[in-house]
Amino acid sequence: VLIKLTLGNSGSNIIGKDEKISIAHDYIGQLNISGTISETETDSVLSSSTYHHRWLLDRIADMKDDKRNKGLMLIVNTPGGSVYASDELYLAIKDYQKKTRRPVYSYMATQATSGGYYISAPCDRIMINRNCWTGSIGVTMGTMYNIKDFLNKMGVKTVTITSGRNKAMGNMTDDMTGEQKKILQSLVDEAYDQFVG
């Protein structure tokens, strides 16, 4: 008898967020990966999507050590998020596969872009809802604002004290140098190369 155990990303479906799994039969663990992938827990006020990074990593580790677990099913519904958190989840999935030799499947529901695509990449099989948005492979550092001129017009003077010439890189009150732009671009390029490599 094989039973599917549904584990909500907050753990509220079956077990409390901090409780361990206790199942009497063989099962396939289902992890719902919903919301923006980040290192911290996120709850969205405007939607029901919640993402609990540590909880997901702990459940993968628990199932890796559980002989009754016979595989993982990821239900992916995320726009992606942090490069670090996406990579940490990707590596946890790869480690689960390597140590257990059990199958891992991904079902891309309505959205699996960027980090959602990345965490699905190592899966043995990927299934996609025909209406799912997926892809959007890339890395962004986001928009960096410079409010120096605005503050000057308002009569506000700023002073930045640092211990290194690039320590204040990205500071909203200082102009970015060509060297700083190259440094930031190299960080984005490195993350992208890891993503597609």
PLM regions and their residue ranges:
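Small-residue-centered hinge/linker elements
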Residues: 1-102, 111-197
